[in-house]
Amino acid sequence: MLTITEIKSYISEAITQYQSVYVGADIVPVTVCPASRRRAVRNRVINECGLDYKEDAYGTDAEVIFGPNGKQILIYQSMMKTKQQVLHALWHEFGHHLSGDEKQYGINLERDTPMRSGYAVFNEFVAEYIAYTVNDAEPFRNAMGSHIYLQMAFHEERTINPYWLSRYFAIVLGDSAVSEDDFAFGQSLVSPAVWNYINQILNVLISQIKKPDFWIADAEFLETLGCLFDEMFHLVFMGA
């Protein structure tokens, strides 16, 4: 585990590298959450952002706290083992800040709609993809990483985890270590029908990241992405 001092020393480097790619992008305050005072520091930041409560996803390495009084990024000392891990975690959270949240798209997360499904995939995809565009030397990465993410996305029977599916697409499109052959191997891990949807979703994401401001989605894109995900989910639920 890195020390608080070590983590803080890497924050300015993360900001410099990020803003060299995303010129003019603003940065929100970053707070290092000590392992020994995780709950207290996290609660303080939540209150400063104007929230009374935000569910704590133990095991996450960093997160954006977004409330009526502003945004802050929390990075957790207990999860930080290397400099590159700190950098990548911060770039990922900077990506979340850059791309915004569901409110700007008018999405009600309590309603099951294609827009919500599309946002669920795009939200994590774009943050992770942005991190790769800054520097794709992600810790622990290798060409097999995409296969692991794909397997995790479909690990539970008759369901799909959109978080791991988003990470899968981000590593396929953003990690230079993943070749076309590596991607093609994925078809051996899922059914032909599911693989067809994987390719359709990939093509939709490729079209999006070709845009100069790819991190800003529109309703048509999210609807298309969400419909594809929902159709694939139905196939998996039915046992495909």
Descriptions of predicted regions:
Residues 1-63, 211-215, 234-237:
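A metal-dependent hydrolase signature that marks the N-terminal structural subdomain at the beginning
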Residues 44-85, 94, 100-101:
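Active-site scaffold of zinc-dependent metalloenzymes
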